[in-house]
Structures are given as structure tokens and as C-alpha cells.
A protein has these predicted regions:
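Divalent metal-coordination and catalytic microenvironments
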Residues: 8, 28, 43, 48, ...
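A conserved active-site cap/scaffold subdomain adjacent to cofactor or substrate pockets
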Residues: 197, 204-262
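A short helix->loop->beta-strand "cap" motif at the edges of active sites that frequently abuts
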Residues: 72-77, 166
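Hydrophobic/aromatic beta-strand patches that form the interior of the parallel beta-sheet core
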Residues: 4, 44, 78, 105, ...
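Short amphipathic alpha-helical segments and helix-helix/interface helices
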Residues: 32, 64-68, 94, 157-158, ...
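His/Asp/Glu-rich metal-coordinating catalytic cores
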Residues: 55, 84-218
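N-terminal active-site segment of His-dependent metallophosphoesterases
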Residues: 1-68, 72, 362-372, 376
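Accessory, non-catalytic peripheral segments of nucleic-acid enzymes
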Residues: 37, 42, 247-379
């Protein structure tokens, strides 16, 4: 049985105040084209369908277009809510959608029952587990000693108890200990929301969502597929892909990926203003990509953001890397302050801000201004 594993669509997301909706539709169309050439038996959507609990109307319309496109291809869809989603909103109409083989995890009310599929090797049980917090599980199982995310997940998965003689797939949205995170994910405080990878041992394949980098955790079949698009510059050097999973007889799982090409890549550029505005440096490149530019000029370039956007219209972020920004000079102790002249105070301030000393010309000019001010005060 073949599956396409997707997660973390984050429909409606904005990156540096740039809307990703057009890029998201583009990549979803590409995924549909992949499915037309690499047929599967079902699609797994492992949470964070939306970027916010109350998504914008345009994001809702985009998902409302994508799910029927999958259903029109006679593909069962198994979707769960993630930590960015509202479980209640994602589950709206779930009973009606199930009639079109679009199965959406309900609001958590206890261990999920398996949804069976069948192929030439027999049944495959699909378990849909939405994003869990300890408080959710304590509410359903008040007699269980649940202090951590691992306690909560373990409590639920013990009740799932997949049949070891049958193949089973779990769709979940949790932070598994040992996985690598990105800047675009919701911050984790001290790893408190981590869960133990061993909790998933009873499942043949675990389709995970939540982390944006494609990766396995421990075994190959405990896997994050990652986002279909880059959502932070910490992902600039990643190669996004769609994950295909094939279940053979019990114990045989084959994984493969297909590259996804975005409408606009998310890249980083570095150089001086003169270098980056030289036609030879950008001719033939995708200047409409989403960019983070780091200027190496020692002096700030006036109106640099607007001027660079003439060439790079989707410049998202502009920073400087120079002596001023690289290190910070130490502040003088108060005891030394009283012994310094006004020019020495200003020179120390200038060095603190720019990490380089006043030139002789600048010092002479400042001394002249100071003497003029002192004369005006004395008068």
C-alpha cells in the first residue's frame, strides 16, 4: 500500500509580512501533478493544515479546493489537527467528509479507533492522533498520573494497542526527542513538549508533523516529512520534498522522496551594496526570490531597503555585518567616567556604536564643536 505523507502546510502563513498563499497554491498544484504521475492509495496530512487557529478566509478556501482535488482522484485522505490549528474548526464537517473518504481527526476524546484499509497483503490500520497536551489527556483520563507530554502520549498509545499481526500507521503531530527544529516552528521551552521515540514502537510507520525539516528520528519509519515550502531563513539550504511510503508485507516499508520546486525560493545573499547592485552579480538569477540580504558595508547605505527592492522586489529582510554589528565594545566603569574629557566620552560612545575609533579629522571636528558649545555656555 502506497501513501503520500505531507504535513505543516501552514495555509495562510505570512513570512516577514509577505503572504505565502500564492506560493502555497503553486506547491499544492505541484503535489497534485506528482500524484498524477506517482499514484498512491492514500494521503496522510500530519497536522498544521493552517498557520493560525482562526485562519484567514483565503486559507480556508485554499484547503477547500485542495481536499476535493484529492477526493476527485479517488484518494482517501487522513488528516489531523496540529498545534497551530483549532481542532474544533479542522474537525468541522468531519462526518460529512468521511463520506468522501476524507477522514479528519475529531477533537480529542480518547484513544483513536483504527480506520482500516486493505490491499493485496491484507489490512492496514490507520490511527489519527491530533496534537496532544497533557491537560487534554488528564481531562479524559483523570486517574492516570500524567505530568509530561510523554506521559500523555504513552497513556493514549497504550490504549490504541495496534495488533502486532496487522500493519499499522499512526498519523501524529508531536515533538519527538532527538529531532532537529527550525526557526519557523513554535518555540519549545526547555524541551518540555518532547516525547520519547520508543512510545511509537508498535507502529509500522509513524507519519509525523510539527517539525519543518525532513528527517527520521531513530528508525527510518519514524519520520517527519517537513514543510513543502521554506518558512524561515534557517531553512534556506534545505531541499523540500514529498515523502512517499510503501508498505509491503508486515515489516517491509520502503521510503522515497520527490523534490518540490517552489514558485519563489527563499535564499540568503551577502555582499556590499555595490556588489549586489552590480548587474553582473544578479543577471540571470531569480531576483524575485524571497531574500535575506546581509550588507557588509562599514557605513549604513541610505534608504538601502527601498533601493535594493528595485532589483530584488521580494527582499524580506536586510541586515548589516560589519565592525559595528559584529562585536560590542565594553562600557567604561563609572569611576573612570569622571576623569574623561567630553571628547573622550564622545570617542568612547562612537567606538561602542561603530566598533572603530574616530578618525583624526572626525576628532578635530568634534573638538571644535565642543569648544564652541562651551564658549556659548560661558557667555
Amino acid at each position: 500500500m502506497r501513501f503520500l505523507h505531507l504535513s505543516d502546510l501552514h495555509l495562510g502563513k505570512r513570512v516577514c509580512e509577505f503572504s505565502m498563499l500564492d506560493d502555497q497554491r503553486y506547491i499544492l498544484e505541484q503535489i497534485l501533478s506528482l500524484l498524477d504521475t506517482r499514484p498512491v492509495d492514500a494521503v496522510l496530512l500530519a497536522g498544521d493544515l493552517y498557520d493560525k487557529p482562526v485562519p484567514p478566509a483565503e486559507a480556508v478556501r485554499l484547503l477547500d479546493w485542495f481536499l476535493p482535488e484529492l477526493a476527485d482522484r479517488k484518494l482517501p485522505v487522513f488528516a489531523i489537527s496540529g498545534n497551530h490549528d483549532s481542532a474544533e474548526r479542522v474537525a468541522f464537517g468531519a462526518h460529512l467528509l468521511a463520506g468522501s473518504q476524507v477522514y479528519v481527526s475529531p477533537v480529542f476524546e480518547g484513544a483513536p479507533a483504527p480506520i482500516p484499509l486493505t490491499d493485496a497483503y491484507g489490512p492496514v490500520d490507520i490511527y489519527l492522533l491530533p496534537f496532544l497536551k497533557p491537560a487534554m489527556v488528564r481531562h479524559i483520563y483523570p486517574d492516570e498520573p500524567i505530568e509530561s507530554y510523554s506521559d500523555a502520549l504513552g497513556c493514549v498509545l497504550r490504549r490504541c494497542a495496534p495488533d502486532p499481526a496487522r500493519r499499522s500507521v499512526l498519523v501524529a503531530h508531536q515533538f519527538v526527542a532527538g529531532a532537529a527544529a527550525c526557526e519557523s516552528e513554535e518555540p519549545s521551552v526547555g524541551g518540555l513538549d518532547c516525547v520519547d521515540a520508543a512510545l511509537f514502537d508498535g507502529f509500522d510507520y509513524v507519519a509525523l508533523g510539527h517539525l519543518h525539516s525532513p528527517q527520521k528520528v531513530g528508525r527510518d519509519t519514524l519520520r517527519y516529512c517537513g514543510t513543502p515550502l521554506k518558512y524561515s531563513f534557517s531553512e534556506a539550504h534545505q531541499h523540500k520534498s514529498a515523502t512517499f511510503v510503501e508498505l509491503g508485507p508486515k515489516g517491509e516499508v520502503t521510503l522515497s522522496t520527490a523534490p518540490l520546486t517552489p514558485k519563489h525560493d527563499l535564499r540568503e545573499l551577502r555582499g556590499s551594496y555595490m556588489e549586489l547592485t552590480d548587474r553582473r552579480s544578479y543577471a540571470g538569477t531569480a531576483t524575485d526570490d524571497y531574500l535575506h540580504i546581509t550588507l557588509t558595508d562599514e557605513q549604513d547605505v541610505p534608504d538601502a531597503l527601498a533601493r535594493l527592492r528595485v532589483i530584488y522586489p521580494n527582499l524580506m529582510r536586510l541586515d548589516y555585518d560589519n565592525l559595528r554589528t559584529r562585536t560590542q565594545a565594553d562600557l567604561d566603569a563609572p569611576a573612570q567616567t569622571e576623569q574623561k574629557t567630553p571628547l573622550e566620552h564622545f570617542a568612547a560612545f562612537y567606538a561602542l556604536q561603530n566598533n572603530q575609533p574616530l578618525s583624526a579629522e572626525q576628532a578635530a571636528f568634534c573638538q571644535q564643536l565642543i569648544e564652541t558649545l562651551w564658549k556659548e555656555e560661558d557667555a
